[in-house]
């Protein structure tokens, strides 16, 4: 028997811990159930267009990354293996966007059945975590390349063979709640069957708040600590070195790229996790304002969309900026790519060990 769900079950749905049930449930914040509101037509018309746009751009740039890796001859670097897995995770995440765009186009009416709801909901969550975890691995690997250049030069690809399965396993474990609870439920006053998180009614608020906080901790706080720590470690180390001329230019480029990784992660994911945290506070009864809850419900789809743009940005941060990117494309397509030509001479000078290792890491 399908339970009846309210609008909050849909607006926070794709990666957050909704919905809530219109039943008498112990331990819930009763105010939440009195704050029902319908989404505007403009709101629901804009979201699918933006989702398809992110899908097209992100899929294209990540396909290039995967193609470059597959066409690369000889042994693969540890950093290249991480970049490849990051691109795969982003591709799989982006591949689900057309379904969610359709979901919004039909006003939160899920047309693909309960099995697809569970599978694609879990698939999205799994690859979202995998993408974030691999970004964290890239930051740690980059830190090691700069701080311990001689040790990092002796890294073998087999070392990544341990890290990569571990990351995917962690992502799978993080998505287990979604796989277990994701299901189709009816929202009567909207006249739709929504793909939602069907938590146990008697512990609904606790589950909703707990899953939201888990996403905050595993998907943002812990990765940000690692990413930011690695950046400041790299910055401190490189600023201590006496670099002149072209070496100084390279050092500044490295620092800018390291800073760009941190800023991109914060800009893309902070809004979603702030709203998710506010959502958890509303379930715990700490936030008791219908206006705040309305903002959460209406803003979350756009915050999730902003998080997805990180999958479009990643190839530019980790692959396309390398000084051998043009060479790799030429090797793959065997045609000159004149539009990528630029001043590369600053990257060809003899560098210090840490700068040289850092430069090849993103190439």
Curated annotation (Swiss-Prot):
Q: Which Pfam families match?
A: 7tm_1
Carrying Phosphoserine, the residues are 354
Q: How does it sit in the membrane?
A: Multi-pass membrane protein
An annotated Gene Ontology molecular function: angiotensin type II receptor activity
Q: What CDD domains has UniProt attached to this entry?
A: 7tmA_AT2R (cd15191)
Name of this protein? Type-2 angiotensin II receptor
What biological function has been recorded for the protein in this entry?
Receptor for angiotensin II, a vasoconstricting peptide. Signals primarily via a non-canonical G-protein- and beta-arrestin independent pathways. Cooperates with MTUS1 to inhibit ERK2 activation and cell proliferation.
Q: Which family does it belong to?
A: Belongs to the G-protein coupled receptor 1 family.
Give the organism, scientific name: Meriones unguiculatus (Mongolian jird)
Q: What is one term from the GO cellular component aspect held by the record?
A: external side of plasma membrane
